[in-house]
Amino acid sequence: MLTTLLPILLLSGWAFCSQDASDGLQRLHMLQISYFRDPYHVWYQGNASLGGHLTHVLEGPDTNTTIIQLQPLQEPESWARTQSGLQSYLLQFHGLVRLVHQERTLAFPLTIRCFLGCELPPEGSRAHVFFEVAVNGSSFVSFRPERALWQADTQVTSGVVTFTLQQLNAYNRTRYELREFLEDTCVQYVQKHISAENTKGSQTSRSYTSLVLGVLVGSFIIAGVAVGIFLCTGGRRC
């Protein structure tokens, strides 16, 4: 089942996550939460913020999720395609959970949270980048960019955690491509935003669009893998 699920998750990546940064620091934060009260009902919440300004919000059931860009980062036609892709991803994501539940009895409610982003420190210091995944309110795994490795965020040793780390650390996409997304794409975008904060025009618009698409593809590819591994194990110790 896992070998079937992982490629689907890796290829179905349309979603984004984020957290509000109200103090206006030079950073990009992304947060996404999926709340399953049972196998058939899910409520999504998410947002993206850049330098303390919300850029996107997402909320609602998978059958009628409201997705809004709060700043005109994409032209209407382009944004409509993004919305459609994201809606498709959410429906597929819910379908995967139901499929796994049919084969393995999962404990509900189930809440999955991913939080990632980059923060630019004072000049001369290294940027702080991160990706954290929590399940049912408890820290699960997180990414360490220094060695491009995932590590456990729980003191409880279990087969589920061990298996998850083995899988996440086995793929270039979930290691080196993720590090590149966080340390390069994310950081460079924030830097460009700072230098062109008061500039309006096509160059800025293209940068925004590129970053938005990067967030949609990059963040949920990794989150989907982590979530899929957890669901495939049924949330139980192996």
From Swiss-Prot:
InterPro entries: Endothetial_C_recpt, MHC_I-like_Ag-recog, MHC_I-like_Ag-recog_sf, MHC_I/II-like_Ag-recog. Its main location: membrane. Pfam families: MHC_I_3. Glycans are attached at N47, N64, N136, N172. GO terms for cellular component: cell surface; centrosome; extracellular exosome; extracellular region; extracellular space; focal adhesion; perinuclear region of cytoplasm; plasma membrane. Keywords: Blood coagulation, Disulfide bond, Glycoprotein, Hemostasis, Membrane, Receptor, Signal, Transmembrane, Transmembrane helix. It is a single-pass type I membrane protein. N-glycosylated. A soluble form exists; probably released by a metalloprotease. Seems to have the same activity as the membrane-bound form. This is Endothelial protein C receptor.
